[in-house]
Amino acid sequence: MNAQFDDATKTLDTLGLRCPEPVMLVRKTIRNMAQGETLLVIADDPATVRDIPGFCRFMEHDLLQQETQATPYRYLIRKKEGQL
């Protein structure tokens, strides 16, 4: 495993869930996190390859790292400073 993924503040397992559930859970989880904390998202829905980066751009969170070559996909998101 990658050290950066290992250091995530929280982990969200969305394996088996399909669009739009993974992104909805990411949004709900990030709302309850402190600014600057990181979230590791584990997913197997192919739509997350598009949806999670799009969510991060729209909400201005930092997508620090992603692994999408094979399932399970992994995304590391940092809650943007100044976001409530």
Swiss-Prot record:
Give GO cellular component annotations, separated by semicolons. cytoplasm
Q: Show the GO MF annotations.
A: sulfur carrier activity
Is Transport a UniProt keyword of this protein? no
One BP annotation, GO: tRNA wobble position uridine thiolation
Entry keywords, A to Z: Cytoplasm, tRNA processing
Cite the active-site annotation.
C19
Asked if the keyword rRNA-binding belongs to this entry, the reply reads no
By its UniProt entry, which InterPro entries does this protein fall under? Sulphur_carrier_TusA, TusA-like, TusA-like_sf
Q: Which domain of life is it from?
A: Bacteria
- Coiled-coil residue spans: none
Instruction: Please name the pathway.
Output: tRNA modification
Q: What are the subcellular locations of this protein?
A: Cytoplasm
Protein family membership = Belongs to the sulfur carrier protein TusA family.
By its UniProt entry, which NCBIfam families does this protein fall under? Answer: PRK00299.1
The subunit field of the Swiss-Prot or TrEMBL record says:
Interacts with IscS.
As for what it does, the entry says: Sulfur carrier protein involved in sulfur trafficking in the cell. Part of a sulfur-relay system required for 2-thiolation during synthesis of 2-thiouridine of the modified wobble base 5-methylaminomethyl-2-thiouridine (mnm(5)s(2)U) in tRNA. Interacts with IscS and stimulates its cysteine desulfurase activity. Accepts an activated sulfur from IscS, which is then transferred to TusD, and thus determines the direction of sulfur flow from IscS to 2-thiouridine formation. Also appears to be involved in sulfur transfer for the biosynthesis of molybdopterin.
Q: What is this protein called?
A: Sulfur carrier protein TusA
What organism, scientifically named, is this protein from? Proteus mirabilis (strain HI4320)
